[in-house]
UniProtKB/Swiss-Prot annotation:
It holds the Pfam family Flavodoxin_2. Keywords: Flavoprotein, FMN, NAD, Oxidoreductase. InterPro entries: Flavodoxin_fold, Flavoprotein-like_sf, FMN-dep_NADH:Q_OxRdtase_AzoR1, NADH:quinone_OxRdtase_FMN_depd. One of its GO terms (molecular function) is FMN binding. The gene is azoR. Homodimer. It comes from Geobacillus stearothermophilus (Bacillus stearothermophilus). Signal peptide: none annotated. Belongs to the azoreductase type 1 family. NCBIfam families: PRK13556.1 (NF010075). It comes from the Bacteria. FMN binds at residues 17-19, 102-105. The lineage of its organism: Bacteria, Bacillati, Bacillota, Bacilli, Bacillales. This is FMN-dependent NADH:quinone oxidoreductase. Binds 1 FMN per subunit.
Length: 211
């Protein structure tokens, strides 16, 4: 069975967020088109996503030194264990759908914490004499992102770092197909905001048939 991991990184729902509204249109249509596929919604604002901190580094260090998981402190076990769970869930999925806003030219920090949890040598990539090699070569990914301005082209394009970062990470993991669906300009041209949103929703529904 095809497994889709629907990863949302927004504190608002589809009634308040452009990206979440487009994401909902996409995933609802996808479920209709692929009723036999399993879709798992991972809401990063509602799930426990540990950040790399002193407990995580300490736990990793103990494990590398030969200690067992049970020998870690309670804090270390909770954080390292959860990061392991997130990584295993990530590598078991066949498709990834990331839904984010653009905040200060990137995405919410909880998504970076999540990526840090799943970027694990030997799991999502490996080191070789020729350099790192991605291990997720049979996956595909989509990023749905709302941007108040216009960043796909023009002078502001080089300022966009959220989608570009995800693109680099997906390449690093070996994911061969990574697409972007952007909701752009609703803040720059507020009188066209609803039209922009409607057009993005229509594109999302179309894409759900081929993704």
């Amino acid at each position: 069975m095809t497994n889709v991991l629907y990863i949302t990184a927004h504190p608002h729902d589809d009634t308040q967020s452009y990206s979440m509204a487009v994401g909902k249109a996409f995933i609802d249509t996808y479920k209709q088109v692929h009723p036999d596929h399993e879709v798992i919604h991972l809401d990063l604002y509602k799930e426990y996503i540990p950040e790399i901190d002193v407990d995580v580094f300490s736990g990793w260090g103990k494990l590398r030194s030969g200690k067992s998981f049970e020998e870690l402190s309670d804090e270390e076990k909770a954080k390292v264990g959860r990061m392991n769970e997130l990584c295993e869930q990530f590598i078991s999925a066949d498709k990834y759908v990331f839904v984010t806003p653009m905040w200060n030219f990137s995405f919410p920090p909880v998504l970076k914490a999540y990526i840090d949890a799943v970027a694990v040598a030997g799991k999502t990539f490996k080191y070789t004499e020729q350099g790192p090699v991605g291990l997720l070569t049979d996956k595909k990914a989509l990023h749905i992102q709302a941007r108040g301005g216009f960043y796909s082209e023009g002078p502001a394009a080089e300022m966009e770092m959220g989608h570009r970062y995800l693109s680099v990470i997906m390449q690093f993991f070996g994911v061969p197909s990574f697409e972007g669906l952007f909701v752009e300009g609703h803040a720059a041209v507020p009188e066209k905001a609803e039209e922009i949103k409607a057009n993005a929703i229509a594109r999302a529904k179309d894409l759900a048939h081929t993704f």
